[in-house]
């Protein structure tokens, strides 16, 4: 009884810590993105609120909370109100299975540095990222606006297509680790990160998660020039904010996924595991921002063609080759 | 070969953006560092006086006719000696687009543009300038020009007495 209670308390503490860290991280990711993009374009970026702009996320939050929250007259009220929540919650839920570090020894018991070490963690992650499509698609549909509908449709098509490539890219990883548990996958990379073992899978996965996060160069759903703002055109106030934060949460989730699956998770010399994990996730996030500052938007047909005609066949081929190699090695 | 070009064209921009990340921004941080506008900068409008210290504006309405956004209004009045002036003169700077067409239209050089650009305020009524706020003490960009000295017929000098003018013809004298 006492033991169960202790486990429960520990889980709640871990939950609170993870939630707090991730939400703060997402807020500051927005700031970091604006600052880095600014520097790449030889401007400063936000630097007025607080020390060098450090309180900007707070100011944004206050602004979003004070804004009028509009619901279009002929929108489907309930779906319209639920859609942003779906986007944010699916992203938050994903953190339940992501391992941040090696198990810790505390009170004579092993404390896993993951909220819940599911043995099908990877499938859980994929299920959630499929659900995330609903937030976008329903948001676009419920707004009763052509722009939002088109944006939602595009987002749906794009996310589903690239999810396929993403799924194919991780099959070799699962095959070498012989497990769906994320902790096991990280432990299998102790000597050599999967990035070097499966470079092709790494490339496919990287491109796929970029498309999945709906960011430049894959920001079709939002394409401001053609679609006003895509699926969240009709959203305002905190509802828009939830979509917005959802995007950055998603960025952290995908960065963590990339870290866990390909960059060797918490393994690294000198520093404690959790630091390495954070460094890797932030590195991936920086890379994403860098790409956004560099690449122009793709054309929609090119995007689809690239997904279906190049990434998916490559992914399949990669599985075959890996399987053959594994069998040959015995 | 074209594939190689494509790959190079994809990779190279990353290097460019990374280099720019470490350059100094060119942004001028405004309230701390103010820039001096060029002499012909089109900032806030003023009404100037002629070298004698009298108001130049003759309330001819040409400026308000030229203004594309209709933000100038005035009422004409006449002094004892026949000299025209504006009883009131109003410019609504919340509508002004600082195009300078009014100053082009002004025949007396009364209306001129300055390089003042800090007009922002939270009170909308504060950017509606009345005549006493517009009228300055100097001549502005042209210190010599005096409209009434040239054409202020019967006000400053009798007919034909202005510099460069010949006295009027007596139309009765050249009858056949
Ligand atoms: S500058 Fe242009 S807009 Fe402004 S008062 Fe003159 S004519 Fe009108
Ligand atoms: S400012 Fe110039 S154009 Fe306008 S009424 Fe006065 S004299 Fe005429």
Curated annotation (Swiss-Prot), chain A:
A Pfam family annotated for this UniProt entry: NADHdh
Give the first-level EC class, as a single word: translocase
Provide the catalytic activity annotation: a quinone + NADH + 5 H(+)(in) = a quinol + NAD(+) + 4 H(+)(out)
Q: What is its EC number?
A: 7.1.1.-
The alphabetized list of GO BP terms reads: aerobic respiration
Coiled-coil residues: none
What's the superkingdom here?
Bacteria
Which GO MF terms does the UniProt record name?
A: NADH dehydrogenase activity; oxidoreductase activity, acting on NAD(P)H, quinone or similar compound as acceptor; quinone binding
Subunit structure, as described in the record: NDH-1 is composed of 14 different subunits. Subunits NuoA, H, J, K, L, M, N constitute the membrane sector of the complex.
NCBIfam families in the record, alphabetically? PRK06076.1-2
Q: What is this protein called?
A: NADH-quinone oxidoreductase subunit H
Native organism is Syntrophotalea carbinolica (strain DSM 2380 / NBRC 103641 / GraBd1)
**What is the name of the gene encoding this protein?**
nuoH
From Swiss-Prot, chain B:
Q: Name one GO molecular function term.
A: 4 iron, 4 sulfur cluster binding
Q: Could you identify this protein by its name?
A: NADH-quinone oxidoreductase subunit I
How are cofactors bound according to the entry's free-text note? Binds 2 [4Fe-4S] clusters per subunit.
In terms of Gene3D superfamilies, this protein maps to: 3.30.70.3270
In terms of PROSITE patterns, this protein maps to:
4FE4S_FER_1, 4FE4S_FER_2
Cofactor field = [4Fe-4S] cluster
- Provenance organism: Syntrophotalea carbinolica (strain DSM 2380 / NBRC 103641 / GraBd1)
Q: What class of enzyme is it?
A: translocase
What Gene Ontology cellular component terms go with this record? plasma membrane
Where does the protein principally reside? membrane
Organism ancestry: Bacteria, Pseudomonadati, Thermodesulfobacteriota, Desulfuromonadia, Desulfuromonadales
Boundaries of every 4Fe-4S ferredoxin-type domain copy: 47-77, 87-116
Q: EC number(s) of the enzyme? A: 7.1.1.-
Residues that span the membrane, as ranges: none
Q: What functional role does this protein have?
A: NDH-1 shuttles electrons from NADH, via FMN and iron-sulfur (Fe-S) centers, to quinones in the respiratory chain. The immediate electron acceptor for the enzyme in this species is believed to be ubiquinone. Couples the redox reaction to proton translocation (for every two electrons transferred, four hydrogen ions are translocated across the cytoplasmic membrane), and thus conserves the redox energy in a proton gradient.
Entry's family note: Belongs to the complex I 23 kDa subunit family.
Q: Which domain of life is it from?
A: Bacteria
Pfam families associated with the record: Fer4_7
What interactions and quaternary structure are annotated?
NDH-1 is composed of 14 different subunits. Subunits NuoA, H, J, K, L, M, N constitute the membrane sector of the complex.
């Amino acid at each position: 009884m006492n033991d169960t209670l202790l486990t429960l308390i520990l889980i709640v503490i871990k939950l609170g810590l993870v939630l707090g860290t991730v939400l703060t991280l997402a807020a500051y990711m927005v700031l970091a993105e604006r600052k880095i993009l600014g520097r790449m374009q030889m401007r400063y970026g936000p630097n007025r609120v607080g020390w060098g702009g450090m309180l900007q996320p707070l100011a944004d939050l206050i602004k979003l909370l004070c804004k009028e929250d509009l619901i279009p007259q002929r929108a489907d009220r309930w779906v319209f109100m639920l859609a942003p929540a779906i986007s944010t919650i699916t992203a938050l839920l994903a953190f339940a299975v992501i391992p941040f570090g090696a198990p810790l020894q505390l009170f004579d018991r092993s404390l896993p540095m993951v909220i819940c070490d599911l043995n099908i963690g990877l499938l859980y992650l994929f299920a959630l990222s499929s659900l995330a499509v609903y937030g976008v698609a329903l948001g676009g549909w419920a707004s009763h606006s052509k722009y939002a509908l088109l944006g939602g449709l595009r987002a749906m098509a794009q996310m589903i297509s690239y999810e396929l490539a993403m799924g194919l890219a991780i099959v070799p990883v699962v095959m070498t680790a012989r497990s769906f548990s994320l902790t096991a996958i990280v432990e299998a990379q102790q000597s050599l990160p999967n990035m070097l073992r499966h470079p092709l899978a790494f490339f496919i996965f990287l491109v796929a998660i970029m498309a999945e996060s709906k960011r430049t160069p894959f920001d079709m759903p939002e394409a401001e020039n053609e679609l006003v703002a895509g699926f969240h055109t009709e959203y305002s106030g905190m509802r828009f904010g939830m979509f917005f934060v959802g995007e950055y949460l998603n960025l952290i989730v995908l960065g963590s996924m990339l870290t866990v699956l390909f960059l060797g998770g918490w393994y690294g010399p000198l520093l404690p595991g959790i630091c390495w994990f954070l460094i890797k996730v932030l590195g991936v996030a920086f890379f994403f921002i860098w790409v956004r500052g560099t690449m122009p938007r793709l054309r929609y047909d090119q995007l689809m063609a690239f997904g279906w005609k190049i990434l998916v066949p490559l992914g399949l081929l990669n599985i075959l080759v890996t399987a053959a190699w594994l069998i040959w090695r015995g | 070969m074209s594939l190689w070009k494509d790959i190079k064209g994809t990779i190279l921009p990353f290097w460019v953006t990374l280099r720019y990340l470490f350059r100094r921004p060119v942004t001028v941080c405004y309230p701390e560092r103010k820039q001096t506008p060029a002499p012909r900068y089109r900032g806030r409008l003023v009404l100037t006086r002629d070298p004698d210290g009298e108001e130049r504006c003759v309330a001819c309405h040409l400026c308000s006719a030229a203004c594309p956004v209709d933000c100038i209004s005035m009422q004409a009045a006449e002094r004892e000696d026949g000299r025209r002036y504006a009883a009131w003169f109003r410019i609504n700077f919340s509508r002004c687009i600082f195009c300078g067409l009014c100053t082009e239209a002004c025949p007396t050089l009364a209306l001129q543009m300055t390089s003042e650009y800090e007009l922002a305020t939270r009170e909308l009524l504060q950017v509606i300038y009345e005549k006493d706020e517009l009228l300055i003490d100097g001549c502005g960009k042209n210190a010599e020009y005096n409209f009434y000295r040239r054409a202020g017929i019967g006000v400053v000098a009798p007919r034909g007495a202005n510099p460069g003018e010949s006295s009027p013809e007596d139309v009765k004298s050249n009858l056949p």
